[in-house]
Design a protein with these regions (language model features):
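C-terminal accessory helical subdomains adjacent to catalytic cores in phosphodiester-
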Residues: 2-9, 20-49, 57-219
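Short hydrophobic beta-strand that contains or immediately precedes a catalytic carboxylate
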Residues: 12-15
Length: 219
């Protein structure tokens, strides 16, 4: 099988219901910020569940193989929450498990974790959210723009505490809040977003030196 170097139509593996719309939107926003306007994820992302489920024997491989077999995509991207797991060590584990599948189908397979959860991205974007949706009555602090939100557990709860007039609901608000994100600001402060941007650049590139991303090894 001929390897398609520069991928444009990734099949997405996502965690839950809200992610099926929010993750493709975020990927498109990040790609467009890099000028990659023709990178458009396939419709109907595959819900694969959380990391503990994917860690079970054969589960990760089953989902990645299913995504590789879809005729509407030229690549695969997994985007799930990392919660309290180490994103680097989990990336090493997962890329090792899917490498053979990527080579068998000659498709690029990228893995991206949101540390700690998808809503953590919104905590890095509180100012932008407050400007786009002022009616929610945002409570902002002076250190919001410099704080490392990836160390904070319970991002959904923190998000709710920041709004006086609104209650966050994942399936209703994920896409809405993604629309407020400034990608350049986000990638300069949030390592998960920067990793996603680099993954998208790798996916789009003509390089076929590696069919899995990130290209991590132990040690």
């Amino acid at each position: 099988m001929t390897i398609l170097a520069g991928a444009r139509k990734p099949v997405l593996l996502v965690e839950g219901d809200g992610d099926t719309h929010a993750v493709p939107f975020l990927i498109r926003k990040v790609a467009e910020s890099s000028g990659l306007h023709d990178l458009v994820p396939c419709s109907n992302p595959i819900k694969c569940g959380e990391i503990p489920k994917l860690r079970k024997q054969g589960q990760l491989e089953r989902f990645v193989q299913y995504a590789c077999q879809r005729n509407d995509g030229d690549s695969v991207v997994l985007v799930v929450d990392c919660d309290d797991d180490c994103p680097v060590l989990t990336s090493v584990e997962f890329t090792a498990r899917v490498r053979e599948i990527a080579e068998r189908y000659s498709k690029k397979v990228g893995i991206a974790f949101i540390h700690k959860e998808f809503e953590t991205v919104f905590l890095f974007s509180l100012l932008e959210l407050s400007l786009k949706y002022p009616e929610h009555g945002w409570r902002l602090n002076n250190d919001d723009n410099t704080r490392d939100w990836s160390t904070v557990r319970g991002a959904k709860g923190e998000l709710n505490r920041r709004m006086k007039n609104y209650s966050y609901k994942e399936t209703r608000d994920q896409v809405k809040f993604v629309s407020a994100i400034d990608v350049d600001n986000l990638t300069s402060t949030c390592r998960s977003a920067l990793h996603l941007q680099r993954l998208i650049d790798w996916l789009y590139s003509d390089s076929t030196n590696f069919l899995v991303y990130p290209t991590l090894t132990h040690g």
